[in-house]
Every structure is written in structure tokens, then in C-alpha cells.
């Protein structure tokens, strides 16, 4: 006997329609960059290969599923994902147990960058590309006793909160392709809050050194003013990185004032805000409305530490006047964003030097101030990356009590963003179609679809065929089964 209440409910056990119609395109990119091989060394879990579990998790993140239970439900309801996974239904417990296992996700992150950046010339790292360095706070209000959480001040929320402090790097290429690189979790010493086991500068050095295992190209490091540290600048110079950052209002700068009667150069302290006031009228006359304008200020120096021998021949650290490129800028992308907070309320000294909307950039490239401005403007891409990850991929949605699960969740988001950014770049690079990150996910990847089984498997999109036909035909996979290689199974007709 079937209860009347249950009989009145529709039965969708074998439904042939659902969301995620563009997941096969995500699978094409996954196979193009060989991401399955990154997890080939992991043993099967619950009868499933590790790369299938990872792909299922990434597909769930793209569908904006905010929990492991929702991800498992999405994978079981989407007919095309079931076909890609070989008809296997993934349970919530299988995902939870797999991503709570001990695994070196930091090494996996490095292998992801190597695999992606070595696959084709368009994804390669070249001279002049920009590495954006920044951190963000991932709030966890109910996890005060978790050892990897910190009690920090959030400028956007204007309050202190318990959070996980994520430090990461992002690559912005000259062709416009954006790729998330490495990440680290900064841990604060809760007994002595003024100290930590490792500083964020140490984590930044570690990530930039790992990037040297992938490429030896001459790169820019574009960073927020929080990373303004003289020792860090010297470290970047010694590791063949160019750098650019915003100047703080209390940064000690010096201007060359000629030389004395012995021919020795004379320097006088100069306030960054006063430098901006001097060139402000010239600055607002340059450039066009809504575009970045800049004016280079010559003969600006900063004291950087260097090891030099003293009279006894012993190496000691001395502060040496070093020329820097000082550029007054206005209308930077980050300054034109209304959601951005202009002042650090927790530490007023961290406020950027400014004058009527103009800011001062400093860089080691004295010979190329224009390139320094372009490199710093690209730093805004990492802010957009954080925003997209939180709003569309659920960066703040992991509530596990183990650090391993959080590390796995972060790496899954970085994998998803690597693939999504490449797809978005392919869609927009010709200029015929202009889609934002969210529009691309909604109109292509998460488009509604219906599967029809005949001699071959047909898939019908609920999206604009004419707009995306060429793109879908180009990147539609030949085979639906996800494996280490291309498996000769049923064909997917690219008839959109």
C-alpha cells in the first residue's frame, strides 16, 4: 500500500532534464589541461576514482551548491553529470570522507599551475606578466576554538570577526587571461596575538619561490600597501621580480636636491601627500574622463637595507638611498569601486597617501613608470577573484571543523576558477560576445538541458543557440566518460 501523501508527489527518479548543460565544456577544459592526472595517485574512494570525486565537487561549486549535501544532490539530479561520472551516484558521505582525508593540497596546487601553464602558448607565463598578491578574510563566526582561525578586523564589515586569513597570488597575462596560482592560510598565535608562527610576508615569499619552479620569466608583483616592507622589496629584487605598490601616508621618501661641495648627493625628506599636491593640477589635465591618468615624479629615493662591509671588514646592514619610480595616479579601478573602504579604521597609519582622489605608486622600475601603473591596475583582478569566489562559488560556505577539509575546499575553488576564467576568456577574446563571470556561468555552464537517449546521446540546451553555437561546437567533447584519457564511448553531438 502506497500512502496517499507520497502518491501525490511527482517521481523524478530517472529525470532526463536539469541544470548544468554546459558541464561537458568544463570537462573538455579539464581534459585539455590534464587535471585528472593530478589525482591519479590517490586510491579509489567508495568505488570512485579520485578525479571523478574532484570533478563532481567542482561541478557542484559552479552550480552554487553551498554544502556537500547540496553538491551530492546536484550531481545525482543533473543527467549530464551522471553520464560524465559513468552513471554513478555520489553520496554526501563519500564526498565528506574523501575531502577530510590527509592530502597535500598545497603540492596539488603547484602541480595544477604547472599543468595549466605548460599546456599551450596562450597559457604560458611570459615576461611582463603580473602576479597580484593579496589576502582576504573568510568569516567563521561559530568556530572560535578552531586553531587555524584568527580574531581580525575587517575593513569592509567595520568590525572584528573570527575568520580564516587566506593569502594568495593570481596571474594576469598580457593577453588578458587570468589564472589563480597559489594560496596559503595565515595562522595567528592566539596566546600572543602580536606574533604569529609565520608572517604573511613569509607566506608570500614561499608562494613566489614555488612559482619559480614553474617559470623563470621576469614578472611583476603588484601588491596592496599592507605588503609595503623594505626587506620584502629587497627579497623581490634578489629573486628577479619587479614590484609596484601604493605608498602609505607615512612612507619615508627622499628627493634628490643636488650635491654638496664634495660632490656628495644631498637628499631631503618629502611627504607623499605633498608630492601629490604639487603635481595634482598637471595630473587632472592628462588622460580622459573615466580612464587612468598618471604623472611621473623624478628624483625620488627610498632607503633600502643592504649588507655592506664596515671599516673592520665585517658585513653590516646599512640603509642605502635607492631610486624608485614615483608615479601620481588617479582613477585607478580599486578607487572607483564604491564597495571599497578608503581608510583602515583599525590602523590609521596604514591609510594610503592621497590628495583629492590621487594616489602615489612606487616601484623599483625607475626606467618604466608607465608599465608600473599598468601593472598595479591589474592588481584589481585579484579583488574581483575574491568577490566572485565568495558570491558565486561559496568560498565562505565550508563549515567543516578540520583544516584539511578547508584546504581541500579552497583548492577546489581555485581549480574551478582556473577553468571558468579560461572559458570566459575564450568566449570574450574575439570581442563578439561580452559576458561577465556570472553571466557566463548562468548562460553556458549552468544552462538548463534535456538528455535524449537514442543510438547516441543527444543534449538540448535551454540557452541562446545563435550566440554560443560556434563556441559550443568548438569545445564540445567527443566522449562523455571522464577518465585519464579520451575514452571511446558514446558520442555527444555538437548540434547547438
Model-derived features: positions:
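Basic, short loop/linker segments at the boundary and entry of helix-turn-helix/winged-helix-like folds
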Residues: 13-56, 194-198
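Short, solvent-exposed helix-loop connector elements
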Residues: 38-45, 369-376, 388-408, 427-430
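Short, conserved catalytic/metal-binding motifs centered on acidic residues
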Residues: 56-57, 71, 91, 95, ...
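Active-site-proximal, Lys/Arg-enriched surface segment
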Residues: 96-177
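Electropositive, glycine- and tryptophan-enriched low-complexity nucleic-acid-binding patches
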Residues: 155-218, 336-360, 367
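An anionic, glycine-rich sequence signature occurring as long contiguous blocks
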Residues: 178, 193-197, 242, 248-381, ...
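Domain-level cores of phosphate- or acyl-group-handling catalytic modules
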Residues: 191-264
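Basic, amphipathic alpha-helical segments enriched in Lys/Arg and hydrophobic/aromatic residues
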Residues: 397-452
Amino acid at each position: 500500500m502506497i500512502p496517499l501523501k507520497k502518491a501525490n508527489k511527482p517521481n523524478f527518479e530517472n529525470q532526463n532534464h536539469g541544470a548544468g548543460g554546459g558541464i561537458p565544456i568544463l570537462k573538455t577544459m579539464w581534459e585539455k589541461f590534464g587535471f585528472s592526472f593530478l589525482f591519479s595517485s590517490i586510491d579509489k574512494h567508495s568505488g570512485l576514482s579520485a578525479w571523478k570525486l574532484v570533478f563532481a565537487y567542482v561541478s557542484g561549486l559552479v552550480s552554487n551548491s553551498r554544502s556537500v549535501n547540496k553538491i551530492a544532490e546536484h550531481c545525482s539530479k543533473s543527467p549530464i553529470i551522471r553520464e560524465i561520472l559513468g552513471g554513478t551516484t555520489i553520496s554526501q558521505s563519500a564526498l565528506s570522507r574523501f575531502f577530510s582525508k590527509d592530502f597535500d593540497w598545497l603540492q596539488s596546487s603547484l602541480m595544477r599551475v604547472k599543468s595549466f601553464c605548460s599546456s599551450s602558448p596562450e597559457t604560458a607565463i611570459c615576461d611582463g606578466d603580473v602576479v597580484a598578491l593579496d589576502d582576504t578574510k573568510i568569516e567563521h563566526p561559530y568556530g572560535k576554538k578552531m586553531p587555524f582561525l584568527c580574531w581580525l578586523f575587517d575593513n569592509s564589515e567595520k568590525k572584528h570577526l573570527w575568520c580564516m586569513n587566506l593569502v594568495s597570488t593570481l596571474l594576469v597575462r598580457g593577453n588578458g587571461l587570468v589564472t589563480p596560482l597559489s594560496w596559503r592560510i595565515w595562522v595567528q598565535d592566539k596566546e600572543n596575538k602580536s606574533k604569529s608562527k609565520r608572517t604573511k610576508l613569509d607566506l608570500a615569499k614561499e608562494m613566489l619561490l614555488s612559482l619559480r619552479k614553474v617559470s623563470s620569466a621576469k614578472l611583476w608583483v603588484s601588491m596592496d600597501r599592507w605588503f609595503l616592507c623594505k626587506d620584502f622589496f629587497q627579497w623581490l629584487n634578489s629573486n628577479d621580480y619587479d614590484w609596484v605598490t601604493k605608498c602609505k601616508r607615512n612612507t619615508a621618501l627622499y628627493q634628490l636636491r643636488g650635491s654638496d661641495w664634495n660632490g656628495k648627493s644631498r637628499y631631503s625628506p618629502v611627504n607623499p601627500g605633498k608630492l601629490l599636491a604639487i603635481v595634482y593640477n598637471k595630473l587632472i589635465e592628462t588622460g580622459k574622463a573615466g580612464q587612468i591618468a598618471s604623472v611621473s615624479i623624478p628624483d625620488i629615493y627610498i632607503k633600502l637595507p643592504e649588507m655592506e662591509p664596515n671599516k673592520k671588514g665585517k658585513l653590516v646592514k646599512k640603509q642605502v638611498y635607492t631610486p624608485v619610480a614615483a608615479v601620481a595616479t588617479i582613477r585607478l579601478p580599486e578607487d572607483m569601486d564604491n564597495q571599497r573602504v578608503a581608510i583602515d579604521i583599525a590602523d590609521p597609519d596604514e591609510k594610503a597617501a592621497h590628495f583629492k582622489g590621487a594616489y602615489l605608486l612606487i616601484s623599483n622600475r625607475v626606467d618604466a613608470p608607465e608599465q608600473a601603473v599598468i601593472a598595479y591596475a591589474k592588481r584589481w583582478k585579484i579583488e574581483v577573484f575574491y568577490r566572485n569566489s565568495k558570491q558565486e562559488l561559496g568560498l565562505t560556505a565550508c563549515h567543516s571543523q578540520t583544516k584539511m577539509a578547508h584546504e581541500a575546499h579552497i583548492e577546489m575553488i581555485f581549480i574551478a576558477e582556473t577553468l571558468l576564467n579560461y572559458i570566459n576568456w575564450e568566449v570574450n577574446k574575439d570581442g563578439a560576445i561580452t559576458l561577465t563571470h556570472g553571466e557566463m556561468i548562468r548562460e553556458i555552464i549552468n544552462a538548463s538541458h534535456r538528455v535524449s537517449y537514442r543510438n547516441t546521446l543527444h543534449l538540448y540546451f535551454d540557452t541562446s543557440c545563435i550566440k554560443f553555437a560556434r563556441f559550443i561546437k568548438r569545445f564540445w567533447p567527443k566522449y562523455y566518460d571522464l577518465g585519464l584519457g579520451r575514452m571511446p564511448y558514446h558520442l555527444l553531438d555538437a548540434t547547438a
